[in-house]
Amino acid sequence: MFKYTRFERARIVGARALQIAMGAPILIDVPEGITPLDAALLEFEKGIIPLTVIRPS
């Protein structure tokens, strides 16, 4: 998996958690009653968050 800075990681997980909270489907199997933030963290750890980071070159 690509090495992200702590700022990129926070932005990715936060953006994905917001998407999940607004009704986006969760891409992994999660236990019942999990928070959107926890679901986003699990997706991030498995490397399946559908977001990309574009760095200026």
Swiss-Prot record:
PROSITE patterns: RNA_POL_K_14KD
Assembly information from the UniProt record: Part of the RNA polymerase complex.
GN (gene name): rpo6
Name listed for the protein in its UniProt record: DNA-directed RNA polymerase subunit Rpo6
Top-rank EC class of the record's enzyme: transferase
Keyword tags: Cytoplasm, DNA-directed RNA polymerase, Nucleotidyltransferase, Transcription, Transferase
Record function comment: DNA-dependent RNA polymerase (RNAP) catalyzes the transcription of DNA into RNA using the four ribonucleoside triphosphates as substrates.
Reactions catalysed according to its record: RNA(n) + a ribonucleoside 5'-triphosphate = RNA(n+1) + diphosphate
InterPro entries reported for this sequence: DNA-dir_RNA_polK_14-18kDa_CS, Pol_omega/Rpo6/RPB6, RPB6/omega-like_sf, Rpo6/Rpb6
EC code: 2.7.7.6
A single Gene Ontology CC term: DNA-directed RNA polymerase complex
Subcellular location as annotated: Cytoplasm
The species this protein was found in: Thermococcus onnurineus (strain NA1)
Pfam families in the cross-refs: RNA_pol_Rpb6
